[in-house]
Design a protein with these regions (language model features):
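Hydrophobic/aromatic-enriched cytosolic interaction surfaces used to assemble or bind macromolecules
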Residues: 1-281
């Protein structure tokens, strides 16, 4: 199986196989993309992106045809909500209909969700806690065209935020680190997710660009400092807010020391999110 992550600036491809209850990574590669080929997660130049992806596949001698893709875009809407508990939690159509009505999005959006728990209202009516994601269909359609162009079979579309949230809430030790801010670092964006009580309670996506920081080589670090300051002010303003216990990075964290030094004034412990134990190389 191939796992492909495409952002506005990069293609990342990982080739892995299931071995028992683990995933063994057999190969990985990355390519830089010319600006404009992908815009805010949308594939704007399918032939050019296909050529780059196909070159990776041919160079690595990859023969697998099944693939999943991870999508990140500010046009993807995230929302936490409480909904009446249906008679059967397997009735996903009913849950998706309630989510669609709650979020006020059209049928042109793909709805996905995670059930984060159950509760009751003041009248003892049973409710479910939902973390919902609405992804524009035309965003997905671009990846369908891309994979068709190079003969890959698209087996799944993962919203990056959902994937990492499932990892966080299914890792028991993570609950002890909350409230925790998880930050995805990328050359083109920052994605900040706040977790409390073993669930995601807020998510914010920031587009970043070198031109906003005089094309400085350390523009990502500057953008992190600026946006984290605003995020922490927002967190403090929330009713009943608790101080952060930890900040965790994932993504492009090769310059972790510089990243952590840039936010040391916030006096919150900083670490890199470790790969799950089920993934081996």
């Amino acid at each position: 199986m191939l796992s492909i992550d495409i952002t506005d600036r990069q293609i990342k491809l990982v080739r892995g196989v299931h071995s028992g209850n683990k995933i063994r990574v057999q190969d990985a590669d990355m390519r830089e993309l010319t600006l404009g080929m992908v815009s805010n997660g949308y594939i704007t130049d399918v032939p050019m992106v296909a050529a780059e992806l196909n070159d990776i596949i041919k160079t690595k001698g990859i023969t697998e045809k099944d693939a999943i893709v991870s999508i990140t875009s500010s046009s993807i809407v995230y929302k936490e909500m409480l909904l009446p508990k249906p008679k059967s939690l397997k009735n996903t159509a009913a849950i998706e209909a309630m989510i669609q009505a709650n979020m006020g999005v059209s049928k042109e959006f793909n709805i996905s969700f995670t059930i984060a728990g159950e509760t009751e209202d003041e009248e003892k009516n049973k409710l479910i806690k939902i973390i919902a994601t609405a992804c524009p269909q035309r965003l997905v359609d671009g990846y369908v065209r891309l994979f068709s162009h190079i003969g890959l079979s698209l087996k799944g579309v993962n919203i990056a935020n959902n994937s990492v949230t499932r990892l966080i809430i299914n890792t028991p030790k993570m609950a002890d680190r909350m409230p925790m801010l998880l930050i995805q670092i990328d050359k083109g964006f920052l994605n900040m997710n706040l977790y409390e009580d073993n669930q995601i309670v807020f998510s914010r996506y920031f587009n970043i660009d070198p031109s906003d920081y005089d094309n400085a080589p350390d523009y990502v670090i500057r953008a992190l400092s600026d946006n984290l300051f605003r995020m922490i002010q927002f967190i403090k303003s929330r009713k009943g807010a608790k101080p952060l216990k930890e900040i965790m990075f994932y993504g492009d964290t090769g310059n972790f020391i510089e990243l952590s030094n840039a936010i040391s004034s916030f006096n919150v412990p900083v670490h890199v999110l470790a790969a799950p134990s089920t993934v081996i190389s």
